[in-house]
Amino acid sequence: MQIQIVIHEEVDETFSTQIQKWTKEVLDKAEYFSLSAYLRLMIWKTLEEFQAFYRKEKEELGVVTGEEADFLATHDAWRGYPRIHICQERVEGIPRGVVQGAMHHEIGHAFHHGRTEFYTFRFSSSLQQAGHSHGLNLALLQQCVYFLSIAIKDQEVVQWLAEIGLGFGQLALLGYLLSDTEEEHQAWELARDSHSLRKIVLAAFLKTLLPIEAMISIGIPEAKILRNQWDEAYGWLPEKEKEGLSLFAVSIKNVEAKTFQERLERGAFRLISDACL
């Protein structure tokens, strides 16, 4: 496998060296894993240049996603091969173990989701019909499926990292993400009275819950503590919705599907039609 590391101007040498070390930690554990023949790791100095790059890429390729600066590190395969981005300015002040977990996480995505099929979604007529019957037009359905796809991919990556002995970084990362859910709370308050918008924000809340449930399922003891932390972090969410998300998180793991697209569509059907959500 060929790895190209692109270090932009003025990135601190200590920072770039540490990022490469954390990248190698995953690569050394995953020698048996089949990966694309090429991986590009891009290390940015400032948020301004990082965001400018993504704006240009989206415009050229017609890609529609969320705001990349919301994440500690990002991955994509828009050009047909896996790319990972991390910005020094973005992670300044973030605990070292959390940034390590974020890098492990994105390398995991490169292994598992390094092809365009994981970033382009099909919306079958039956799924669109189900969405329409529950108040989701195509634009809203796309948002719902987008957030669900993030959660499912994160579930797969976190479980894999835990299985190869790198779960400690994911525990740190998830704990950090649960330390502040004020934005999620605000989103819930805005969406709670709209049946269609509720589905979208609840799909977004699965980003942390699905990985936690995955680690519980393979016997990671600390994951149960993290599960309690999730309940506390989302204490403002009504019990009906919390219970519905918990049941969904367990059920989606057991969905039988041959491809990611098939699993995503079946999960979307369940999420849209679930009366508890």
Predicted regions and their residues:
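Non-catalytic, well-ordered alpha-helical scaffold segments
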Residues: G101, Q155-V158, A203
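Short pre-active-site segment immediately N-terminal to the catalytic Zn-binding motif
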Residues: I86-M103
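A generic secondary-structure signal for well-formed alpha-helical elements
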Residues: F111-R115, G165-F168
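Post-HEXXH active-site segment of zinc metalloproteases
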Residues: P95-G97, H112-F147
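Auxiliary, metal-adjacent structural segments of Zn-dependent hydrolase domains
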Residues: Q2, E10-I84, G93, Q143, ...
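Catalytic glutamate of the conserved HExxH
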Residues: A102, E106-A110, G114
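Pan-zinc metallopeptidase signature
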Residues: F168-L277
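An active-site-proximal "capping" alpha-helix that borders the catalytic cofactor pocket
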Residues: F147-G167
